[in-house]
Amino acid sequence: MLWDLSGGMVDQRFLVILCMVAFLAGCTQSPVTASVIVMEMTGAQPVLIWLLISSIIASIISHQFSPKPFYHFAAGCFLQQMQARQAEELRSKTEQEK
């Protein structure tokens, strides 16, 4: 679909790389890191500026939907689950001692 919008003027591989970096930057909200990782994975050093632009835009849009990056959100949920499990174990242990 995106390739059709370009009228076939843009190489499909370039669009795939831009979408890769946008997805990674949107999830991590780390545009520079996402750009460097995708650049190193694909060997796309000549298009680094386009990777940075795409990742910055994706990161800004992602921040509008969720102020926290995905990994911070996931870590918070994991921490809450572990604290609840630990509290339950402590509660059952004190009940057994009675």
Curated annotation (Swiss-Prot):
It is a multi-pass membrane protein. It is found in: Cell membrane. InterPro entries: Cl-channel_core (IPR014743), ClC (IPR001807). Gene3D superfamilies: Clc chloride channel. One of its GO terms (molecular function) is chloride transmembrane transporter activity. Keywords: Cell membrane, Membrane, Transmembrane, Transmembrane helix. Coiled coil: none annotated. GO terms for cellular component: plasma membrane. The chain crosses the membrane at residues 14-34, 41-61. It holds the Pfam family Voltage_CLC. It comes from the Bacteria. This is Uncharacterized protein HI_0633.
